[in-house]
Amino acid sequence: MSADKFYIEKELSWLSFNERVLQEAADKTVPLIERIRFLGIFSNNLDEFYKVRFSDVKRRILINREQGGNDISKHLLSKMQSKALKLNERFDELYNELIRDMARRHIFLVNESQLDEAQQKWIIKYFQKEVLPHITPLMLTDEIDVLQFLKDEYAYIAVELKQQEQAKYALLEIPTDHLPRFIMVPEQKGKRKKTIILLDNIIRFCLNDIFRGFFDYDELNGYAMKMTRDAEYDLRHEVEYSLLEQMSEGLSQRLTALPVRFVYERDMPEDMLKYLCYKLKISHYDSLIPGGRYHNFKDFIAFPNVGRDYLENKPLPPLACADFEGYANAFDAIRNQDILLHYPYHSFEHITELVRQASFDPKVVSIKINVYRVAKNSRLMNSLIDAVHNGKRVTVVVELQARFDEEANIEWSKRLTDAGVHVIFGVPGMKIHAKLLLITRREEQGFVRYAHIGTGNFHERTARIYTDFSLLTADQELAAEVRGVFSYIMNPFRPIKFRHLIVSPRNSRSQLYRLLDREIHNAQAGKKASITLKVNNLVDKGLISKLYAASSAGVKIRMIIRGMCSLVPGLEGISENIEIISIIDRFLEHPRVLVVHNDGDPQVFISSADWMERNIDNRIEVMSPVRDARIKQRIIDILSIQFTDTVKARRIDKEMSNNYVERGNRKKIRSQIAIYDYLKNVEKHTRKQKGQVEPNDNNE
């Protein structure tokens, strides 16, 4: 059997994942406005795909061409382009379908040719007052380097000014940094009709108001376009440059990087298209994609609901964790027993409140945290600044190389440093992706450490839409090893042994192999053996080979993979014992969890790391055992609920068909809703045991 049959290219698997996102937009059981927002999510994902995955393959082609290598990457690029074009065609079909569905509910997304006289007058006034001050045409001439001025991933209108047989060209940036993309057009009182127009179409309607009096023309035409640049950048690892300076320079490289995709309105004249491709230095390896009138569909993630409540998902108020209740402070609660939070079902407020309390608690002497992505106006980060003002020793490890969050992290680094926080940037070339918080208190018996080990970021906003686990513990063995991780970050060459935590790149590969080998050995000895894995991405060939070996030995393997999956299930004699599902729903599945049967004494681990070579060998990641039996069972229960999903689970197979899982039972189980109900009952039971009153749902 060829190696290709054992391994699905991660880029094609990623496109298959985005197809699952598109399935949500097609699902008529999903509320209408949410379906439109899934189109925005699909588009945002595809933008990132071209900036990262597509760019990487293109780079490999150019390197192979210089070195005289083979054309495997060319073949892959061709397959990627073909699949992406098919998905775009399906996207266009769904968009038109959803526009019709909205109209049936008296919501109209109109263009500039569909306005009545009263609406036209309102649009002209709105344009003159709100839009025109933000519009400055960029006139295209042979002397101007357009690439120097065009912004990555911004929507533009390419304007053709025709006079007889001559044509001038200009570019207009759609100013969504200053104005909303979707504008409600006032209707007569009493009308049920709701009319929305895109900012793009307001500009199209008023093109004459921009150019009249400055240029002579007989005809004026506008066409949508967007360019995607390569997102990679090179860092100069030189002694005289700090990492902060290197990152700032790297981001400047990204601003002027060559394009990898050019999307244009399919009605654009051929001469205009050729001229723009010439000015943008579009090569035959890049994706040239004809599209509709609108680009930057990622803005549709924030599409407004101007209709009835039923057009959106029913709210699921975040649950208050009862384990914190009845204590004077969060530290007393954590010292009593380990606490597991599962977002967004639980409120992230518990973490911001923990850090707030630590910022002024007289017993707290130090706080250490590592930051990968945080909210723009993060209360948690502001509490760290408050802690310094209150005399606490605060150390923040900021990952400057968090893709697409680099600028925000640079800005936070400056604010923290100015406030007196000890800011560390880690090791150049090795991202720090662990999710750790360590608070040290001086108590009666001496110093006591409280640790947070998580699967997701300390980000107040994404914690409302990403599912993740946070383990809070006063287990001094685990807390000491969390302290050891911070020491390792500050001095990666210092020998540190981890007995409980599994830490990349120190021991993750060897420890994961050890855990999988033990299940293989148990199966070969005739014992029951099983592996349950949940990750975002599974593409590491070494770990995939080990999973194949486990399946061949008779180990039962069940996996939940949200995104890329290069393992091929269902291969005779190789992966017959492997079942893989993927769940796409209202929340983005993000935890990394491993459960091994361990001869009847299950071990449960939560982790920040996906099963990718970069996460196992080239990043600082932390995987922690769950030692509290109560929490272990809770995580196992949550995974079990997901494997019973009959609504949102798709089966991952070698054909990447994305078929929904059919389980033969009539009862519909939507796992995310079932998990919410399960955790709600857990909190209710905990309060009952404590003799406490259940909080009102409105305050949860």
Swiss-Prot record:
Gene3D superfamilies: Endonuclease Chain A, Polyphosphate kinase middle domain, Polyphosphate kinase N-terminal domain. GO terms for biological process: polyphosphate biosynthetic process. The active site is at H433. Its cofactor is Mg(2+). GO terms for cellular component: polyphosphate kinase complex. Pfam families: PP_kinase, PP_kinase_C, PP_kinase_C_1, PP_kinase_N. Residues 428-462, 585-615 form the PLD phosphodiesterase domain. Keywords: ATP-binding, Kinase, Magnesium, Metal-binding, Nucleotide-binding, Phosphoprotein, Repeat, Transferase. It catalyses: [phosphate](n) + ATP = [phosphate](n+1) + ADP. InterPro entries: PLipase_D/transphosphatidylase, PP_kinase, PP_kinase_C_1, PP_kinase_middle, PP_kinase_middle_dom_sf, PPK_C_dom2, PPK_N_dom, PPK_N_dom_sf. ATP binds at N45, Y466, R562, H590. Its EC number is 2.7.4.1. Mg(2+) binds at R373, R403. GO terms for molecular function: ATP binding; metal ion binding; polyphosphate kinase activity. An intermediate of this reaction is the autophosphorylated ppk in which a phosphate is covalently linked to a histidine residue through a N-P bond. PANTHER family: POLYPHOSPHATE KINASE. Catalyzes the reversible transfer of the terminal phosphate of ATP to form a long-chain polyphosphate (polyP). Belongs to the polyphosphate kinase 1 (PPK1) family. This is Polyphosphate kinase. It comes from Vibrio vulnificus (strain YJ016). The gene is ppk.
